[in-house]
Amino acid sequence: MLKPPLPLRSLLFLQLSLLGVGLNSTVPMPNGNEDITPDFFLTATPSETLSVSSLPLPEVQCFVFNVEYMNCTWNSSSEPRPTNLTLHYWYKNSNDDKVQECGHYLFSREVTAGCWLQKEEIHLYETFVVQLRDPREPRRQSTQKLKLQNLVIPWAPENLTLHNLSESQLELSWSNRHLDHCLEHVVQYRSDWDRSWTEQSVDHRNSFSLPSVDGQKFYTFRVRSRYNPLCGSAQRWSEWSHPIHWGSNTSKENPLFASEAVLIPLGSMGLIISLICVYYWLERSIPRIPTLKNLEDLVTEYHGNFSAWSGVSKGLAESLQPDYSEWLCHVSEIPPKGGAPGEGPGGSPCSQHSPYWAPPCYTLKPETGALIP
């Protein structure tokens, strides 16, 4: 059997070796917690086979509460398995730039979910660097840089007080703890006649004046605060203060709303009752139109009584009957040649049809033809 030339044979071995590298690449065994999956196979590898070190760590959120303490928290439930992550922090470009681990962890379901830092550990105007680590995967960590002056949340205003400046003018005042010169405020108020709040911004002051109030209304006021641009660029407002009230609370409801609440049901009931009365009046005053198929009932069942058959009410039928009596009177003429007027069988020229009175009878006078009583 002939053997292929040496150059062609070496070329075939070279192609096979290249294919073997693409299909069966050998990866050295890791010494520590290295990922054993090559980078070009990550997209084709199912998510179940990914190592924990390839998963990102949750984001850390820090808030400074009234520059008294700071909480840095993260979502511990985002981990594939319960993991006690550790938090380390330091301040960039400062004298206190050494890395420190959190000394007071916050827990959620017995797993670390945050860190509490006291006032002495807070440097408000220095860059705060926070690093979250997985103790079981040293290479798995995330670092964030934060400006703490933009993360301050003040306490809600306290000691709200109202003063009467005049008969129709009120002044609202309040106090804050420790941060009066760095706060801006929002005042909301409404009366018991209003459905929504009226909002007014107040800068660098702890008071607000309302120039026109109605003593017959019941007013409610509340205030909240925020770290203003002079000291930071915080976006989070404090909680609302406890409300304070002023005015007459005898009328708890708007009179307009109260009258509507009473008049609308009464008007509806009156309309329904009126419609029922009209319906029964029409039933009694307007007879029903009989149908042709029931004409035989007029003879068989009602014996010719049209009123009963047609549905005319008894009162209406009686109202159509006359309330007087009429008498019939026969008028006769005298014979032309002195004849005696004809008398009836009873000897009277008139037929009396009533036992109470007899109507007058008239005869013709021969000369004039006029009626003579």
Swiss-Prot record:
Residues 23-261 are extracellular. Pfam families: CRLF2-like_D2 (PF21605), TSLPR_D1 (PF22012). Keywords: Cell membrane, Disulfide bond, Glycoprotein, Membrane, Phosphoprotein, Receptor, Signal, Transmembrane, Transmembrane helix. Glycans are attached at residues 24, 71, 75, 84, 159, 164, 249. This is Cytokine receptor common subunit gamma. It is found in: Cell membrane; Cell surface. It comes from the Eukaryota. GO terms for cellular component: cell surface; external side of plasma membrane; nucleoplasm. PROSITE patterns: FN3 (PS50853), HEMATOPO_REC_S_F1 (PS01355). The WSXWS motif appears to be necessary for proper protein folding and thereby efficient intracellular transport and cell-surface receptor binding. The box 1 motif is required for JAK interaction and/or activation. It is a single-pass type I membrane protein. It is linked to Defects in IL2RG are the cause of a canine X-linked severe combined immunodeficiency. GO terms for biological process: CD4-positive, CD25-positive, alpha-beta regulatory T cell differentiation; cellular homeostasis; cytokine-mediated signaling pathway; gene expression; interleukin-15-mediated signaling pathway; interleukin-2-mediated signaling pathway; interleukin-7-mediated signaling pathway; interleukin-9-mediated signaling pathway. The modification Phosphothreonine is found at residue 291. InterPro entries: CRLF2-like_D2, FN3_dom, FN3_sf, Hempt_rcpt_S_F1_CS, Ig-like_fold, TSLPR_D1. It comes from Canis lupus familiaris. Residues 284-373 are cytoplasmic. Belongs to the type I cytokine receptor family. Type 5 subfamily. Disulfide bonds join 62-72, 102-115.
